[in-house]
């Protein structure tokens, strides 16, 4: 979102964060409602377990690659990537392994399935807000080669992806979670997390597509 503009509506930020996976927009929204602690309190109040929100993305991302705290000079992906490239490879690899072992800002598949169930059942927000979020999750074009690629014709998929960068081929996070609805209107939550993989992006995506096909076969 930033630095092209400095003023956004909440809905514009939601579109950027959910549909386009804009971390800056997500951070702005989270700060508006009280920060990571407020999100955690909300989840706990809804009996959502095994899902942790501890930091803003601007705190998480530099740590993943062994960088210093985020600064304005790194705005934009090109500037951030250039700064990351100055970190020795061994430092980046060590930081990534530390990140993968860190329980902060993590979720288990079981915890995420619970969160998705609450979302699908309308327990987390008002009906209008629930519909808006699910609509944005369906509208995303990100991760079309992951779980969505394994779903049958006529199915819809409200989902969101997560992807970290890599250090010498080691990928810390490759995720896709959501709710798929089959043509007969049956809905199911699905969560796929992959960490510490050295496979290519295409190989990881193909694995997720296979997982979705397996899930569809399992539910008949």
Residue positions per predicted region:
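Flexible, active-site-adjacent loop/turn segments at secondary-structure boundaries
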Residues: 6, 16, 51, 145, ...
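Structured C-terminal helix/loop/strand segments within mature extracytoplasmic catalytic/sensor domains
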Residues: 97, 101-220
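Charged/polar, solvent-exposed surface patches and flexible loops
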Residues: 12, 16, 31, 41, ...
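Short, glycine/proline-biased beta-turn/loop segments that scaffold the active-site neighborhood
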Residues: 1-3
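Mid-domain, small-residue-enriched loop/turn segments at the edges of structured enzyme/sensor domains
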Residues: 5-9, 14, 20-124
